[in-house]
Amino acid sequence: MLKLRNLLAVGKSNNNAVRSLSTTPSRNDSESWFSKLLVRKIEPTKESHSRMLSDKEIIYALHTHNVRPDSMGSYLNNYKTTVALINEKKANLSCELVASWTVQVGDMDQCLHLWKYTGGFEKIDQAKEDLWNDPEYLSLMQERSKFLRSRHLQYLLAFSYWPQIASRTGKNIYEMRSYRLTPGTMIEWGNNWARAINYRKHNNEAFAGFFSQIGRLYNVHHIWCYKSLQDRKETREAAWRSPGWDECVAYTVPLIREMHCRVLAPTEFSPSQ
């Protein structure tokens, strides 16, 4: 009886050893995959994240206007006149319109306007003061309020590793992919996308990349330019076929709390078409 018990104990020990050996590679693979889902610790720094990721002397203002459905034409005419007025004062205001869009897929009856200020927040303060003392500008704002349901403003900084913003010509559509990140992960996002952006340059689709400075914080906006929705599909599929792109995505997905995309069409007065 004792010998039988000993044999069973040895057999159980051997089975455990075999089971352990047979599952080790699977566990290692699982741990390797799972490690990509963990947010890595970023070492403390005495520099602000914005200073490490961007040129703080160039600030972008993203105006989001939700327009009454029956007033889109009147609204666009009003804003076109406003842009012309500001262009006349461009030298004093140190600002210029980069692009202007209407939303085609996503938040309908919505318009986005991207302005660039050179000289930091000092120039923004100066421009606001000058415009608020301009009767024509105030009249246009008052008229525009009749066409709006709501509006929102964010001040943004451009990621330094993205290509320089260049106006596009011809017929294009744009996609704005907006992300709300977990607080404290902006540097890790930047480190990963500094590599990932190299996989998205083959079709010249990268238009602009921003993160929020004032307004909704821990917001990131990536703006892509395509010839059509079909061109978008083919360009994105080509990126997924590039070795390394999937790994970049795997590291950035855990940093995201929320994301959404909008397909945009440039307005007739947008500098970038």
Swiss-Prot record:
It comes from the Eukaryota. Coiled coil: none annotated. One of its GO terms (biological process) is oxidative phosphorylation. One of its GO terms (cellular component) is mitochondrial outer membrane. SUPFAM superfamilies: Dimeric alpha+beta barrel (SSF54909). Belongs to the NipSnap family. This is Protein NipSnap. The gene is Nipsnap.
